[in-house]
Amino acid sequence: MKILVTGFTPFGGEQINPSWEAARRLPNRIGGAELIKHEIPTEFDASGAALHKLLTELRPDAVLCVGQYGGANCIRVERVAINLRDARIADNAGKQPTDEPVVAGGPDAYFATIPTREIVDALREQGIPAQLSYSAGTFVCNNLLYCALHESAQSYPALRCGFVHVPYLPEQTKDGNAPSMGLEMMVKALETAAEVIAEEEKQ
């Protein structure tokens, strides 16, 4: 099986994005699955277009999107994506939508189709702080998860899609007051998530 793992480009003045730093360090195979890693632009329109191109070309069995959640103190496994773009800051293309749908006429929300609770349980068993999250926000992270789930519902019903938010890296918290997580633990968390997804696909 093939699992597409995506991370984002830096945004909001940051020089790095831990989602891609962790994703790109994943092995090429895990749990019998091939991991294909791609960096996605932190832009509302371009992120969905990039994902569409990857799904068309690669035809993966599962998609695990990864994003940065500044201020988080653990791995957040997202359960739902909502059909809303409402940006506090502009994306990397300068776009800052307010109260816009991700997909005009699309459903209000989609639930993630990867085994979210099982991933959280597996992470905690390894001593990695993790929780289920019921809001992926209204920025590009939620946008990408909604696009993935919408495209799955429309064209690839067997495709499993989900999203994991990671905290800041220590070097991003200059004053030391914001929560952070080491890169090694983030990579281990993504490896574990991929293993759980691969195991479910075998069943």
Q: What are the roles of these predicted feature ranges?
A:
Residues R124, N143, L159-C161, V166-E171:
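C-terminal folded domains that constitute the principal catalytic or ligand-binding module
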Residues M1-A136, L149-A158, A178-Q203:
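N-terminal catalytic or cofactor-binding beta/alpha core of small enzyme domains
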Residues L58, F139, L145-Y146, F163:
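Broad hydrophobic/π-residue packing in well-ordered secondary structure
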Residues G13, C141, L169-G176:
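Short active-site-adjacent structural elements
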